[in-house]
Amino acid sequence: MVGCGSDDHGAGGGSFVADIRPAIEAVEAELGEGQQYFEVTANELVTNLFVAVDDATAAVPYVYLDGELQPPAPKLTGASGFTFSADAVDFDEETVLEPVREELPDSTVEAFSIEAGAGGVVRYVVSTLSPEGGRLDVTVAADGTVLEVDPL
């Protein structure tokens, strides 16, 4: 995935993480409340949502672009794994990226993902790119506290 850098290092309204909740709300407005998601990932360009269907054996990808939910992509069959609901999404969009940006000031935050875990819990992952080309996935708590770092 190619991400765009941003001069805006604040979170909240000026950051792409602020698009996640409206994107989920748009899917729920389109399909009904209580949808289950395999993953939601936002970057500077779009927010991608993978909605679980057919008893979580398939996923329907949606793109939220410029404040609008786009028509769904074709269903992806053979999906499996954990899912989560909108109620499980509890990150603080004002602070969730700040610890990573403070620890890696020269790196670009390329994406923020919400991934499903066992029991409907979620895992938040910040994907970064260093000026030297190294990539890290940084798992964070809802407030941005760094929990784990995985080099890619």
Say what each PLM segment does:
Residues 26-61, 114-140:
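Exposed beta-strand-loop-beta-strand "reactive/processing" segments of non-cytosolic proteins
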Residues 16-19, 92, 141:
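Alpha-helix initiation/capping motif
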Residues 58-77, 134-152:
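A short, surface-exposed beta-strand/turn
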Residues 66-111:
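Long, charged/polar, surface-exposed segments that mediate recognition or autoinhibition
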Residues 10-39, 109-111, 146-148, 152:
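A cross-kingdom feature marking solvent-exposed beta-strand/loop segments within repeated
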Residues 4-8:
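Bacterial signal peptide processing site
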Residues 10, 93-95, 120:
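Low-complexity, compositionally biased segments
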